[in-house]
């Protein structure tokens, strides 16, 4: 199955809110059962294999839509604070915080040394991957927090995440 299937962006505020409501309701309902009383922990899962790898990370654009573009711009604003600082970091006199775009697949795949990137020439891609991975981590924290707040007693939460940088040879996996 190599066809790209539309999936929610992990940066989507709507997805985080709506799925958060579903997770909270699930937790409340499960906690009210005998099985729920026996639980000591819940694994929060999403993405490919339930391990927070981005949907379609093989040969497809990964999270390059409007939600991620907006998140990337907010992230850049927090990191650089001004167009001048962004231009200096990216070596691009036309770069602006308001118009920055997610690097396309070709730019993200091009590298001079395997998984290593040279910030002097590839800072735009470095920034995108850092934003992307922080977005995943923030989504994980969001859902773990909801589970803990929705459960009537202390509960362990966790997830499968945090593989080596070059897992699958695809930095964009998540």
Residue ranges and their predicted role:
Residues 1-174:
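Polysaccharide-binding and catalytic clefts of secreted carbohydrate-active enzymes
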């Amino acid at each position: 199955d190599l066809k790209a299937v539309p999936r929610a962006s992990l940066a989507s505020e709507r997805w985080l809110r709506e799925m958060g409501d579903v997770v909270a309701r699930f937790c409340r309902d499960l906690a009210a059962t005998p099985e729920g009383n026996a639980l000591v922990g819940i694994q929060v899962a999403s993405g490919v294999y339930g391990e927070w790898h981005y949907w379609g990370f093989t040969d497809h654009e990964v999270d390059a839509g409007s939600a991620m573009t907006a998140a990337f711009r907010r992230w850049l604003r927090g990191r650089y604070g001004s167009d001048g600082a962004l231009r200096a970091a990216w070596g691009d006199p036309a770069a602006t915080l308001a118009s920055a775009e997610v690097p396309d697949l070709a730019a993200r795949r091009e590298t001079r040394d395997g998984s290593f990137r040279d910030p002097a020439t590839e800072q735009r891609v470095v920034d995108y991957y850092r934003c992307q991975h922080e977005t995943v981590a923030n989504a994980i924290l969001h859902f773990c927090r909801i589970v803990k707040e929705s459960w009537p007693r202390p509960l362990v939460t966790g997830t499968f995440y945090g593989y080596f940088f070059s897992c699958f040879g695809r930095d964009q996996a998540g």
